C-alpha cells in the first residue's frame, strides 16, 4: 500500500505526521516490511489468512500516531464529561484503538462502516476531525451531527460511516441492508457492521446473518469482544463465547484485536471473502480500559490487576511503539515528542470546539425525516417555539 494512501486516513493527524517525518530522522521509507501477527488466527469453516503481514515504516508510524490521537481524545473526553461539558451517555474506546485503525487500513472510503454507541474513534478513522468530534460531544453546532447526536450518534456520510447507534445490536440489520444495496448496485465494496459481545445474543443479529448468507451479501459482522457487556462477563451471558463460530453456516475468524496488523490482515481477507462469497464473522479479541460508560467505574466486576495486566502485555499503541523502535524507524525521544504534539493538538481542538454555539431551537425539527416525502415533524410549523435548550 502506497504511503500516499496511508497518509490520508485521519487528515489532521496525518499532516502532522508528514511534517514530523520531514523535520526529523523518523523514517519515511515505503520499503515493505513483513511482520508476523502476535498470535495465529483461529478460523471456522474457512482457511485463515497468513500471519505474515506486509507493512511499511510509514504505515507503522501512521498507526502509532492515529492510535495515540484516539487515546488522547478519549482521555480528554473523560475530563470533559467530569467537568459537565459533555452530557448524557458517553462510551469511551481507549484500549480498542487497533480495531478502528487496522480496519481502516484494509479498506477504502467506498466501503461502509456502521457501529454501536462506542463510535468516536471509528469516526476519526473514517476521516473525521477532532474539532467536529469534540463539538458533537459537547452538543455544539460544529459537531458532526450538528450537536444533536452526542456521543452515541457520530456520523459521516461522505465517508460512508453510518453511525453510532444507541440500541444494542440494532445497527447490524442496517449494516446488512447497506450490504444489500452494494450488491444490488453491483459495487465491489463491502459493509463492516460492528457490535459488542453484549449484543452477540440478540435475535436480530442472527436474522440479519441468515438473510445475508441466503443472498450472499458482502457483509462482514465484526464482534468487538471486550469481554464485558456493561458489567456482565461474557461467560455469564454466553453459553458459547466463541463468537466467530456463532454464524454456524457462515465462516468466521478470531483475531487479536489489540494487534493493529492482525486487524488489518483479517479485514483485508474478510472484504475479499465477502465480495466473492458472502458474509463472514470476525471476532476481535480486544479490551476497554474505561468502564462501560461514564457511570461505570469499571472496577467492580474486574480487578485493577486485570486491567493493568492488559495494559502491560497487550496495549495496541505500545506494541507498535516496540515495532518502530525494533526496526529503527524512530527514536524513543521522537515518539515522545510526537505524543506531546498530539496533546497540544487535542487541547487546541477542544478550545476551538468550545467556541461553537449551541444549536438553535429550530434544529429540533430538522433532519428528522428524509426530505421529499411530504412529512414534517409535528409542531414544526409553529411560529413560536416553546422548547428551549440549556
UniProtKB/Swiss-Prot annotation:
Cellular component annotations (GO), alphabetically ordered: mitochondrial matrix
Cited PANTHER family: PYRUVATE DEHYDROGENASE E1 COMPONENT SUBUNIT ALPHA, PYRUVATE DEHYDROGENASE E1 COMPONENT, ALPHA SUBUNIT BACTERIAL AND ORGANELLAR
Record GO biological process: pyruvate decarboxylation to acetyl-CoA
Matches recorded under Gene3D superfamilies: 3.40.50.970
CDD domains cross-referenced by the UniProt entry: TPP_E1_PDC_ADC_BCADC
EC number: 1.2.4.1
Residues holding pyruvate: 91, 117-118, 166, 168, 197-199, 226, 228
Transit peptide range per the UniProt entry: 1-15
An MF annotation (GO) of this entry: metal ion binding
Cofactor: thiamine diphosphate; Mg(2+)
Enzyme superclass (EC): oxidoreductase
Organism of origin: Oryza sativa subsp. japonica (Rice)
Subunit description: Tetramer of 2 alpha and 2 beta subunits.
UniProt KW keywords: Magnesium, Metal-binding, Mitochondrion, Oxidoreductase, Phosphoprotein, Pyruvate, Thiamine pyrophosphate, Transit peptide
Protein name: Pyruvate dehydrogenase E1 component subunit alpha-1, mitochondrial
Segment forming the signal sequence: none
Feature: compositional bias, Basic and acidic residues: 302-312
General function of this protein: The pyruvate dehydrogenase complex catalyzes the overall conversion of pyruvate to acetyl-CoA and CO(2). It contains multiple copies of three enzymatic components: pyruvate dehydrogenase (E1), dihydrolipoamide acetyltransferase (E2) and lipoamide dehydrogenase (E3).
Residues the record lists as binding thiamine diphosphate: 117-118, 166, 168, 197-199, 226, 292
Amino acid at each position: 500500500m502506497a504511503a500516499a494512501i496511508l497518509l490520508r486516513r485521519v487528515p489532521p493527524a496525518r499532516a502532522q505526521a508528514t511534517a514530523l517525518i520531514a523535520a526529523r530522522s523518523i523514517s519515511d521509507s515505503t520499503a515493505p516490511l513483513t511482520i508476523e501477527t502476535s498470535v495465529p488466527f483461529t478460523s471456522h469453516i474457512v482457511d485463515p489468512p497468513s500471519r505474515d503481514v506486509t507493512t511499511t515504516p510509514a504505515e507503522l508510524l501512521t498507526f502509532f500516531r492515529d492510535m495515540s490521537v484516539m487515546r488522547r481524545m478519549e482521555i480528554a473526553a473523560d475530563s470533559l464529561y467530569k467537568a459537565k461539558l459533555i452530557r448524557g451517555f458517553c462510551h469511551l474506546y481507549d484500549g480498542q484503538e487497533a480495531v478502528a485503525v487496522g480496519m481502516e487500513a484494509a479498506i477504502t472510503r467506498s466501503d461502509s462502516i456502521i457501529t454501536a454507541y462506542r463510535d468516536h474513534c471509528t469516526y476519526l478513522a473514517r476521516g473525521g476531525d477532532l474539532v467536529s468530534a469534540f463539538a458533537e460531544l459537547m452538543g455544539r453546532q460544529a459537531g458532526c451531527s450538528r450537536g444533536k447526536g452526542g456521543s452515541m450518534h457520530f456520523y459521516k456520510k461522505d465517508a460512508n460511516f453510518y453511525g453510532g447507534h444507541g440500541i444494542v445490536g440494532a445497527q447490524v440489520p442496517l449494516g446488512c441492508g447497506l450490504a444489500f444495496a452494494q450488491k444490488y448496485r453491483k459495487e465491489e465494496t463491502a459493509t463492516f457492521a460492528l457490535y459488542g459481545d453484549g449484543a452477540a445474543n440478540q435475535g436480530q443479529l442472527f436474522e440479519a446473518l441468515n438473510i445475508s448468507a441466503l443472498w450472499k451479501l458482502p457483509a462482514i459482522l465484526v464482534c468487538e469482544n471486550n469481554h464485558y457487556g456493561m458489567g456482565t462477563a461474557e461467560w455469564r451471558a454466553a453459553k458459547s463465547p466463541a463468537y466467530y463460530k456463532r454464524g454456524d453456516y457462515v465462516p468466521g475468524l478470531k483475531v487479536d484485536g489489540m494487534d493493529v496488523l492482525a486487524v488489518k490482515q483479517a479485514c483485508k481477507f474478510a472484504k475479499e471473502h465477502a465480495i466473492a462469497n458472502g458474509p463472514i464473522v470476525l471476532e476481535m479479541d480486544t479490551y476497554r480500559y474505561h468502564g462501560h460508560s461514564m457511570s461505570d467505574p469499571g472496577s467492580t466486576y474486574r480487578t485493577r490487576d486485570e486491567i493493568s495486566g492488559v495494559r502491560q502485555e497487550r496495549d495496541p499503541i505500545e506494541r507498535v511503539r516496540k515495532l518502530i523502535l525494533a526496526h529503527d524507524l524512530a527514536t524513543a525521544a521522537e515518539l515522545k515528542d510526537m505524543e506531546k504534539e498530539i496533546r497540544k493538538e487535542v487541547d487546541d481542538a477542544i478550545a476551538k470546539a468550545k467556541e461553537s454555539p449551541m444549536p438553535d431551537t429550530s434544529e429540533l425539527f430538522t433532519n428528522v425525516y428524509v426530505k421529499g416525502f411530504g412529512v414534517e415533524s409535528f409542531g414544526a410549523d409553529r411560529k413560536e417555539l416553546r422548547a428551549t435548550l440549556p
